[in-house]
């Protein structure tokens, strides 16, 4: 990657491909990703930009690595463990390791967020029936989650 990559239009960068969020599945909707920094040259982490259309959501998942998220566009409702967080532009959200999490748009405009993760990370795990039952024990969480 060049030392400087120009933004070509809002939330789009020269030479950075807009990709599907994940390769397949119905456990997410209306979300794309862009890999802004791939972690080479000793960086040790990746910086990704995710964009979620109004009414969209990420997958409900957990993994051994942490996430550091900064909203840069729109508003979100975020599940972190068993807590629902309302976040807006420039808010920070930390997702600790092995914590169930899901992001959903809140409002009529797209949601955009930067997500920093370690380059060396594991594959996300989706909840099994037992984990879903535990999450759904809280009525607010049960109403929120989409699988």
Language-model segments: residues:
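A short, N-terminal "cap"/entry segment at the start of jelly-roll beta-barrel domains
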Residues: 1-44, 128-147
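Conserved short histidine dyad/triad with adjacent acidic residue
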Residues: 47-63
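A short hydrophobic beta-strand segment most commonly corresponding to one strand
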Residues: 49, 94, 108-126
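A generic "binding-loop/recognition-motif" signal
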Residues: 56, 64-65, 83, 99-100, ...
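Short beta-strand His + acidic residue motifs that chelate non-heme Fe in jelly-roll/DSBH
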Residues: 58-60, 78-79, 95, 101-107, ...
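Glycine- and acidic-residue-biased ligand/ion/polar-headgroup-sensing regions
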Residues: 65-67, 71-76, 81
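Short acidic-glycine-tyrosine-enriched beta hairpin
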Residues: 82-98
């Amino acid at each position: 990657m060049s030392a400087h990559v120009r933004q070509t239009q809002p939330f789009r960068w020269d030479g950075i491909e807009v990709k599907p969020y994940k390769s397949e599945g119905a456990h997410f909707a209306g979300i794309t990703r862009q890999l802004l920094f791939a972690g080479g040259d000793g960086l040790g982490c990746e910086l990704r930009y995710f964009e979620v259309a109004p009414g969209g959501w990420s997958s409900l998942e957990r993994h051994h690595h942490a996430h550091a998220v900064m909203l840069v566009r729109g508003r979100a409702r975020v599940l972190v463990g068993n807590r629902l967080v309302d976040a807006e532009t420039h808010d920070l959200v930390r997702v600790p390791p092995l914590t169930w999490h899901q992001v959903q748009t809140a409002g009529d405009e797209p949601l955009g967020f930067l997500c920093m993760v370690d380059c060396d990370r594991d594959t996300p795990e989706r909840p099994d029936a037992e984990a879903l039952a535990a999450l759904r024990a809280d009525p607010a969480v049960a109403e929120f989650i989409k699988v």
